[in-house]
Amino acid sequence: MYPAHLLVLLAVCVSLLGASDIPPQPLNLYQFSNMIQCANHGRRPTKHYMDYGCYCGKGGSGTPVDELDRCCKIHDDCYGEAEKSQNCAPYWTWYTWKCGSDGPQCDDSETGCQRSVCECDAIAAKCFAKAPYNDANWDIDTETRCQ
């Protein structure tokens, strides 16, 4: 999915939430984006991680191209495990967290699905912050490089 599609989807979802009687809640992808910014101290825009390597962005296959792409594969696998073990929908699960001096920290009151998804996102955000970013691995031809 292209970054523009994600933004349109986010705008539609936020509009629908605002039109309901339920107070709007942040979507998980919005929270994850904020966690990434917390972990990397705003050094790299979140959109740079949306179409990177074989696993950063929608889907994923093949062998990760580098350390950053491995972070995305680990995140994908973590979401998969949360879906199986917690029977939850990670992309739509809301949780409470804060940006601490050591990066994103999940609220201790979170349990179950919320805790699992929050931990997946926090671990990935910290991994992103540590991994080198290689411009050559952004927007690669996944058909040929991710088999």
Curated annotation (Swiss-Prot):
Catalytically driven reaction(s): a 1,2-diacyl-sn-glycero-3-phosphocholine + H2O = a 1-acyl-sn-glycero-3-phosphocholine + a fatty acid + H(+)
Residues spanning the signal sequence: 1-19
A Pfam family annotated for this UniProt entry: Phospholip_A2_1
Cofactor(s) it depends on: Ca(2+)
Any one Gene Ontology cellular component term annotated for this protein: extracellular region
Tissues and organs where the protein is expressed, per its UniProt entry: Expressed by the venom gland.
GO molecular function: calcium ion binding; calcium-dependent phospholipase A2 activity; phospholipid binding; toxin activity
Record: active site: H75, D121
Family of the protein in this entry: Belongs to the phospholipase A2 family. Group I subfamily. D49 sub-subfamily.
Functional description taken from the UniProt entry: Snake venom phospholipase A2 (PLA2) that inhibits collagen-induced platelet aggregation. PLA2 catalyzes the calcium-dependent hydrolysis of the 2-acyl groups in 3-sn-phosphoglycerides.
GO biological process: arachidonate secretion; lipid catabolic process; phospholipid metabolic process
Cystines in this chain: C38-C99, C54-C146, C56-C72, C71-C127, C78-C120, C88-C113, C106-C118
Protein location: Secreted
Positions annotated to bind Ca(2+): Y55, G57, G59, D76
Keyword annotations: Calcium, Disulfide bond, Hemostasis impairing toxin, Hydrolase, Lipid degradation, Lipid metabolism, Metal-binding, Platelet aggregation inhibiting toxin, Secreted, Signal, Toxin
Chain positions listed as propeptide in the UniProt record: 20-27
Species whose genome carries this gene: Austrelaps superbus
Protein name: Acidic phospholipase A2 S7-48J
